[in-house]
Protein backbone atom coordinates (compact mmCIF):
# COMPACT_ATOMS: atom_id res chain seq x y z
CA UNK A 1 0.00 0.00 0.00
CA UNK A 2 1.46 3.36 -0.99
CA UNK A 3 1.98 6.28 1.36
CA UNK A 4 -0.18 8.43 -0.91
CA UNK A 5 -3.20 6.12 -0.70
CA UNK A 6 -2.75 5.65 3.05
CA UNK A 7 -2.67 9.41 3.59
CA UNK A 8 -5.67 9.85 1.32
CA UNK A 9 -7.70 7.27 3.29
CA UNK A 10 -6.75 8.87 6.62
CA UNK A 11 -7.57 12.28 5.16
CA UNK A 12 -11.07 11.18 4.11
CA UNK A 13 -11.72 9.62 7.54
CA UNK A 14 -10.52 12.79 9.30
CA UNK A 15 -12.61 15.06 7.06
CA UNK A 16 -15.74 12.99 7.70
CA UNK A 17 -15.09 13.08 11.47
CA UNK A 18 -14.45 16.82 11.41
CA UNK A 19 -17.57 17.50 9.36
CA UNK A 20 -19.68 15.44 11.76
CA UNK A 21 -18.50 17.67 14.59
CA UNK A 22 -18.98 20.89 12.61
CA UNK A 23 -22.55 19.83 11.85
CA UNK A 24 -23.43 18.40 15.27
CA UNK A 25 -21.99 21.03 17.65
CA UNK A 26 -24.26 23.88 16.48
CA UNK A 27 -27.21 21.48 16.82
CA UNK A 28 -26.17 20.83 20.42
CA UNK A 29 -26.03 24.60 20.90
CA UNK A 30 -29.62 24.85 19.62
CA UNK A 31 -30.78 22.30 22.19
CA UNK A 32 -28.66 23.96 24.88
CA UNK A 33 -30.31 27.35 24.26
CA UNK A 34 -33.80 25.85 24.17
CA UNK A 35 -33.33 23.72 27.33
CA UNK A 36 -31.21 25.92 29.51
CA UNK A 37 -32.03 24.87 33.05
CA UNK A 38 -29.13 24.22 35.40
CA UNK A 39 -29.19 20.41 35.21
CA UNK A 40 -29.46 20.08 31.41
CA UNK A 41 -26.98 22.91 30.92
CA UNK A 42 -24.35 20.88 32.80
CA UNK A 43 -25.00 17.86 30.58
CA UNK A 44 -24.81 19.93 27.38
CA UNK A 45 -21.57 21.56 28.52
CA UNK A 46 -19.98 18.13 28.99
CA UNK A 47 -21.24 16.85 25.63
CA UNK A 48 -20.14 19.99 23.76
CA UNK A 49 -16.69 20.07 25.33
CA UNK A 50 -16.05 16.37 24.69
CA UNK A 51 -17.18 16.68 21.08
CA UNK A 52 -14.75 19.57 20.53
CA UNK A 53 -11.77 18.12 22.41
CA UNK A 54 -12.06 14.42 21.55
CA UNK A 55 -13.42 14.49 17.99
CA UNK A 56 -13.34 17.91 16.33
CA UNK A 57 -9.90 19.22 17.30
CA UNK A 58 -7.99 16.00 16.49
CA UNK A 59 -9.97 15.52 13.26
CA UNK A 60 -9.19 19.06 12.09
CA UNK A 61 -5.49 18.65 12.88
CA UNK A 62 -5.31 15.28 11.10
CA UNK A 63 -7.22 16.75 8.13
CA UNK A 64 -4.65 19.54 7.81
CA UNK A 65 -1.60 17.28 8.32
CA UNK A 66 -2.73 14.66 5.82
CA UNK A 67 -3.97 17.25 3.33
CA UNK A 68 -0.68 19.13 3.38
CA UNK A 69 1.24 15.84 3.16
CA UNK A 70 -0.76 14.79 0.10
CA UNK A 71 -0.10 18.22 -1.43
CA UNK A 72 3.63 17.74 -0.79
CA UNK A 73 3.58 14.30 -2.46
CA UNK A 74 1.66 15.60 -5.49
CA UNK A 75 3.99 18.57 -5.83
CA UNK A 76 3.64 22.02 -4.36
CA UNK A 77 3.11 23.51 -7.83
CA UNK A 78 -0.38 21.94 -7.82
CA UNK A 79 -1.49 24.92 -5.71
CA UNK A 80 -1.73 26.82 -8.98
CA UNK A 81 -4.67 24.67 -10.06
CA UNK A 82 -7.98 26.45 -9.58
CA UNK A 83 -9.73 23.62 -7.78
CA UNK A 84 -6.98 23.17 -5.18
CA UNK A 85 -6.66 26.90 -4.53
CA UNK A 86 -10.42 27.14 -3.99
CA UNK A 87 -10.37 24.03 -1.79
CA UNK A 88 -7.68 25.58 0.42
CA UNK A 89 -9.72 28.77 0.76
CA UNK A 90 -12.78 26.75 1.77
CA UNK A 91 -10.80 24.64 4.26
CA UNK A 92 -9.46 27.87 5.78
CA UNK A 93 -13.09 29.03 6.03
CA UNK A 94 -14.04 25.78 7.79
CA UNK A 95 -11.11 26.25 10.16
CA UNK A 96 -12.33 29.77 10.94
CA UNK A 97 -15.83 28.38 11.51
CA UNK A 98 -14.30 25.79 13.84
CA UNK A 99 -12.63 28.62 15.75
CA UNK A 100 -15.92 30.50 15.97
CA UNK A 101 -17.62 27.39 17.38
CA UNK A 102 -14.80 27.15 19.94
CA UNK A 103 -15.59 30.70 21.02
CA UNK A 104 -19.30 29.86 21.28
CA UNK A 105 -18.39 26.80 23.35
CA UNK A 106 -16.40 29.02 25.72
CA UNK A 107 -19.40 31.38 26.00
CA UNK A 108 -21.62 28.45 27.00
CA UNK A 109 -19.01 27.19 29.49
CA UNK A 110 -18.97 30.62 31.16
CA UNK A 111 -22.78 31.02 30.95
CA UNK A 112 -22.46 34.07 28.71
CA UNK A 113 -24.09 32.87 25.52
CA UNK A 114 -26.35 35.56 24.10
CA UNK A 115 -27.12 33.93 20.75
CA UNK A 116 -30.51 32.45 19.90
CA UNK A 117 -31.35 28.93 18.78
CA UNK A 118 -32.38 30.49 15.47
CA UNK A 119 -28.85 31.86 15.04
CA UNK A 120 -27.32 28.42 15.62
CA UNK A 121 -29.81 26.80 13.23
CA UNK A 122 -28.78 29.33 10.56
CA UNK A 123 -25.02 28.93 10.97
CA UNK A 124 -25.43 25.16 11.02
CA UNK A 125 -25.91 25.38 7.23
CA UNK A 126 -22.45 26.90 6.62
CA UNK A 127 -20.43 23.66 6.72
CA UNK A 128 -23.01 21.89 4.56
CA UNK A 129 -22.70 24.50 1.83
CA UNK A 130 -18.90 24.40 2.00
CA UNK A 131 -18.92 20.59 1.94
CA UNK A 132 -21.05 20.53 -1.23
CA UNK A 133 -18.71 22.96 -2.98
CA UNK A 134 -15.56 21.07 -1.90
CA UNK A 135 -16.95 17.72 -3.07
CA UNK A 136 -17.73 19.17 -6.51
CA UNK A 137 -14.25 20.75 -6.69
CA UNK A 138 -12.54 17.48 -5.77
CA UNK A 139 -14.61 15.37 -8.17
CA UNK A 140 -14.55 17.70 -11.19
CA UNK A 141 -11.18 19.43 -10.57
CA UNK A 142 -11.82 22.53 -12.69
CA UNK A 143 -8.63 23.84 -14.28
What are these regions (language model features)?
Residues 1-143:
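Polytopic transmembrane helical bundles with strong interfacial aromatic enrichment
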Amino acid sequence: MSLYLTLKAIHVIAVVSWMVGLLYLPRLFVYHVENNNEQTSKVFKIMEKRLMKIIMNPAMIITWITGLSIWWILGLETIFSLWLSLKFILVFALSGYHGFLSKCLKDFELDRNDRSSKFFRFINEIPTIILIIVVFLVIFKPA
